[in-house]
């Protein structure tokens, strides 16, 4: 049975170290020119696999390219992690696009459009009432 405390501790450590690696050790213009952050890390109970969810304000194609670049660099990142943290085995890394931010922004945009539409309809009704 997996030790949830250990998984949480390893997840926290991985998030901290991977963030530092992304900021300081990767020399990738695409990553440096776009703000990216780790929104969530999921580590399996046996600590063999780790999914890293990346959020970014970049547009769709650029987001995909960022994730592709990170997945291409995952062995290098894993190597650096192995040097920095004491674990028998560093988990296999997989970078995923966290679309929660983009979905949230699209919901806010829809709500704003709905609010504007309602406001415009109310203005027209008031204008019609004034003309009567």
From Swiss-Prot:
Q: Does the keyword GTP-binding apply?
A: no
Output the Gene3D superfamilies linked to this UniProt entry.
Answer: 3.30.300.20
What Pfam families is this protein classified in? RBFA
> What highest taxon heads this organism's lineage?
Bacteria
Looking up InterPro entries in the UniProt record yields:
KH_dom-like_a/b, RbfA, RbfA_dom_sf, Ribosome-bd_factorA_CS
In which compartments does the protein localize? Cytoplasm
Instruction: Give the record's keywords alphabetically.
Output: Cytoplasm, Ribosome biogenesis
Any Gene Ontology CC annotation: cytosol
The Gene Ontology biological process terms listed for this entry are: maturation of SSU-rRNA
Q: In terms of one coarse class, where is the protein primarily found? A: cytoplasm
Annotated GO molecular function terms are:
ribosomal small subunit binding
**Function of this protein?**
One of several proteins that assist in the late maturation steps of the functional core of the 30S ribosomal subunit. Associates with free 30S ribosomal subunits (but not with 30S subunits that are part of 70S ribosomes or polysomes). Required for efficient processing of 16S rRNA. May interact with the 5'-terminal helix region of 16S rRNA.
Q: Which family does it belong to?
A: Belongs to the RbfA family.
Subunit structure of this entry?
A: Monomer. Binds 30S ribosomal subunits, but not 50S ribosomal subunits or 70S ribosomes.
Protein's recorded name: Ribosome-binding factor A
- Species source reads Prochlorococcus marinus (strain MIT 9515)
Q: Which gene encodes it?
A: rbfA
């Amino acid at each position: 049975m997996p030790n949830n405390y250990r998984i949480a501790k390893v997840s926290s450590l991985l998030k901290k170290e991977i963030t530092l690696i992304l900021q300081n050790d990767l020399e990738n213009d695409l990553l440096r020119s776009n703000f990216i952050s780790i929104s969530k890390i999921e580590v399996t109970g046996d600590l063999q696999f780790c999914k890293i969810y990346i959020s970014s304000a970049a547009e769709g194609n650029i987001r995909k390219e960022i994730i592709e670049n990170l997945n291409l660099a995952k062995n290098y990142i894993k190597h650096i992690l192995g040097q920095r943290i004491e674990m028998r085995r560093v988990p296999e890394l997989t970078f995923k696009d966290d679309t929660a931010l983009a979905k949230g922004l699209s919901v806010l945009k829809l709500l704003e459009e709905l609010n504007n539409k309602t406001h415009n309809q109310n203005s027209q009704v008031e204008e019609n009432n004034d003309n009567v």
